UniProtKB/Swiss-Prot annotation:
Gene3D superfamilies: 2.60.40.2860. Residues 1-23 form the signal peptide. Glycans are attached at N24, N29, N93, N112, N185, N295, N306, N383, N396, N400, N416. It is found in: Cell surface; Cell membrane. InterPro entries: 6_CYS_dom, 6_CYS_dom_sf, Parasite_Repro/Invasion_Surf. Disulfide bonds join C64-C138, C81-C136, C164-C188, C202-C281, C222-C279. Residues 450-472 form a propeptide. Residues 24-157, 160-299 form the 6-Cys domain. PANTHER family: ANCHORED PROTEIN, PUTATIVE (AFU_ORTHOLOGUE AFUA_4G09600)-RELATED, PTHR38796. This is Sporozoite surface protein P36p.
Length: 472
């Protein structure tokens, strides 16, 4: 009996030695303004690990702390971190396969522009299509066996960001709600409210794609500067106080070409004035314009669908809420409702068109009143108009559905298979390559850190003590 107890205790000791003595030490994070900072001491005798969870609006700073008096070098793997990284590894090493970060996850904005290669900057992203971890290693040349881990962890999101993507991107590479392609002039209308995040993108997220030749974002630092009333260039800080734009206007992160054509604005929780602003994407002779209607609160203009331009049906015609905004009616919901309730009166709509063009004619009002009381004809026209409205609605819904899916057809989808899609398919069932490593039970239970054994160790020790007391 005693011999079995000793054998049991020996195996328990070896088990604990493996997972306690050799697990990584997770370093704490420090918050400073919009920065989330984690520092690693590469001269430490224990393998250290920094894990930062994605949070949009944050800038993540990893520091591989170097004692410059030692005159020793630090080594970073992959050597082009953050352009290349390891993904979804528990404990990667120098022989682990590298991936091109932006092929797999094009919305990640990160760089290492430090002369001594000891600082790494990343922006938190507003959208992630999957659960994924990006990892780099840093260590001292005098202690090459102790490799420290820096990790960015992303959780899958189901809700995309309000905004306009003019990059003709497939759904897997599109994080904005509205998709347009710059093969013709187009416009995109977004209605925003306090606390919303809004985005614009001009870039087709495929490396070296000819679509990206001769691209221009106007203004080139949208949303830092925006067009007010279509042609007046103003600072968003003055138009929408307390708003914040990502990427920030600083030299902290040197943007790649791809990330120079995308921008996000975070609206404050309180907005005092309704404002209409715009930015545009240009490709050769084609222009795609994004109109952003920022409201102080949700009212009759509130949109509950898929962020394409709302319309109120007037007989067999349509009047857009963008037009209502231009008329100055956004502050008068009663007048808007009056317009909608009179939709069977075609002359009333024509009257509003004249009003919009500042060409008011009193005779139009008299004609509209006369026709509105013309019984049988009005009823016949109303019935006919209802049919036209239904047909127009079906047509618009079909167009909206097409726009939402990025204006690409089945053949285009077969041809433009993205690097991300190839990677995703190659690591799943039906491929001869090994499956990509998934999150383990312990990672889901205790977090994404490679040191998830740390909590498991406590349970193990408690379990062994209980067994020991029972057997003793």
């Amino acid at each position: 009996m005693m011999k079995r107890r000793r054998i049991f205790m020996y195996y328990c000791f070896c088990f604990l030695l493996k997972y306690v003595a050799f697990s990584n030490v997770t370093n704490p994070n420090t918050t400073l303004g919009h920065f989330e900072i984690c520092k690693i001491n590469i001269y430490s005798g224990d393998a250290e690990e920094c894990v930062l969870e994605n949070e949009f609006g944050k800038m993540f700073l990893f520091i591989c702390d170097i004692d410059y008096n030692e005159m020793s070098k630090n080594i970073v793997l992959p050597s082009e971190c953050a352009k290349k990284t390891y993904i979804d590894h528990v404990n990667p090493n120098g022989t682990s396969p590298e991936v091109n970060t932006y092929d797999i996850f094009p919305d990640l904005i990160g760089a290492n522009e430090s002369k001594f290669r000891d600082k790494f900057y990343f922006y938190g992203t507003p959208y992630s299509s999957k659960d994924i971890d990006f990892i780099c290693l840093c260590f001292s040349e005098v202690k090459p066996d102790i490799k420290h881990i820096i990790k960015m962890s992303f959780k899958k999101m189901t809700k995309k960001i309000k905004g306009c993507d003019f990059g003709d991107n497939v759904p897997t590479k599109k994080d904005l709600t509205n998709g347009k392609a710059l093969y013709e002039n187009s416009s995109c209308h977004i209605y925003a409210y306090p606390g919303d995040v809004i985005g614009i993108n001009c870039y087709k997220k495929d490396i070296n794609n000819i679509y990206n030749n001769n691209l221009e974002l106007s203004p080139n630092n949208c949303f830092h500067n925006v067009y007010y009333e279509n042609d007046i260039l103003l600072s968003s800080k003055n138009l929408i106080p307390n708003s914040r734009v990502i990427p920030d206007p600083s030299n902290d992160v040197k943007l790649s070409k791809m990330h120079s054509y995308m921008s996000y604005i975070i609206l404050p929780d309180e907005i005092n004035e309704n404002v209409k602003i715009s930015c545009s994407c240009k490709r050769n002779e084609y222009v795609g314009t994004m109109f952003l209607y920022v409201n102080t609160s949700k009212n009759i203009l509130t949109y509950t669908g898929n962020n394409v331009e709302e319309t109120a049906h007037l007989n067999d015609h349509y009047i857009s809420i963008g037009d209502m905004w231009d008329m100055g009616l956004y502050e008068n919901p009663e007048q808007i409702q009056s317009i909608i309730s009179n939709h069977a009166n075609k002359k009333y709509y024509e009257h509003m068109k004249i009003y919009k063009g500042n060409k008011m004619d009193p005779s139009d009002e008299d004609e509209s009143n006369e026709n509105a009381h013309n019984g049988n004809r009005a009823n016949k026209d109303a019935n006919y108009s209802e049919k036209m409205v239904d047909n127009r609605r079906q047509k618009n819904n079909s167009l909206n559905h097409t726009n939402y899916h990025g204006n690409y057809n089945e053949n285009d989808n077969e041809i433009n298979i993205s690097t991300h899609d190839k990677y995703y398919e190659d690591h799943h069932l039906g491929s001869n390559r090994p499956l990509r490593k998934k999150r383990t039970f312990w990672q889901n239970l205790f977090g994404t850190s490679s040191s998830y054994y740390e909590v498991f160790n406590y349970f193990s020790i408690a379990f062994i003590l209980i067994i020991h007391m029972l057997l003793w």
